Amino acid sequence: MSAYSRPVLLLLCGLLLFTISIAVLNTLVPLWLSHQQLPTWQVGMVSSSYFSGNLVGTLIAGRIIQQLGFNRSYHYSCILFALATCGLMLSVDFWSWLGWRFFAGVACALIWVIVESALLRSGTVTNRGQLLAAYMMVYYLGTVTGQLLLGVVSTQLLSVIPWVSALVITAMLPLLFAHFSHQDSGDVPHIAVWPMLKRRSARLGINGCIISGVLLGSLYGLLPLYLSHQGMSDASVGWWMALLVSSGIIGQWPIGKMADRYGRLLVLRIQVFVVILGSIAILGNYALAPALFILGCAGFTLYPVAMAWACEKVSADKLVAMNQALLMSYTIGSLTGPTMTSLLMQRYSDNLLFIMIAGVALVYLMMLLRKPDQQKTPFAAV
């Protein structure tokens, strides 16, 4: 029996439309704020507000799914995102956009947890890997499509918000024709997340997810601003962001295969080293396209390899708790990365974006080069 049943395909179609909307806004929001002459640190704070919403959404998703089920939770999350998107048209100021992007972040995290949980529930032990692989491919495909759209449509706020909101509402339609059952909360044992964060054997994976969050959060939130300050148009920024994400898609399969064959520790070391090389190449004003390509290949594949490292350290009954802990770790990194980096960029130079990325990557590389039994982390028990 195929893993891609009719409900699964409909769910992935909805996710594709939703992800296109996310990608468009994640690129244009910092550009719109920059056009309004807001300082760089405020642009970074708005990006961090979105990731704060991601963290809150991750924490409340389980209870919402238990109370409402997959379908209703999905529809309400889409409505919340559409409302938060329309709110951007009311006024372009720091405080209101801080709130609207927070609610958008909550909605996005809810959608991610809902889709992932529904796919895992509908799959079996033998095909869950295929389902999650399809999930990642659809997510990145939607991200690239959103970036490419910026080159063919108007990027003015009042032009973009209506069709993006309509796209989100359209993303609700596929799940009107599919149903995902959810067990009662009494059938699901309580899962503690904090002990997973303290697990010594998984510390490299947990730290890797934090570093991945810092890296990708900074790139998503501040790279459009960096490119805009280099004199690029909004359409050009979209093309460069599409190249970055496309390289992440290309790198998924071969890097995953290498991690299975040669070991995740070796591959993590190579990935982090390549991230440092890509950052140095951009700082040195070398060819931007190859530098962004290798940065995307290594950076966008860091999270799944680190996640696999951590998940192989726990038993099957603890996988859900570990996955939730890793997503929280990634979100914390995504929250702190743009905040710290934007403050440094505002005070010193836009080049601090890639200096920061190279710096945190170097710290993680030093951890990876130590023997596993010598690792220390702020989360791991000592």
Swiss-Prot record:
Q: What is this protein called?
A: Uncharacterized MFS-type transporter YE1530
- Entries under InterPro entries matching the protein: MFS, MFS_dom, MFS_trans_sf, MFS_YcaD, MFS_YcaD-like
- SUPFAM superfamilies the UniProt entry points to: MFS general substrate transporter
For this protein's source organism, the top of the classification is:
Bacteria, Pseudomonadati, Pseudomonadota, Gammaproteobacteria, Enterobacterales
The UniProt family comment states:
Belongs to the major facilitator superfamily. YcaD (TC 2.A.1.26) family.
Per the record, GO CC terms?
plasma membrane
Give the membrane topology, semicolon-separated if more than one.
Multi-pass membrane protein
Native organism: Yersinia enterocolitica serotype O:8 / biotype 1B (strain NCTC 13174 / 8081)
Annotated PROSITE patterns: MFS (PS50850)
UniProt subcellular location = Cell inner membrane
A Pfam match is MFS_1
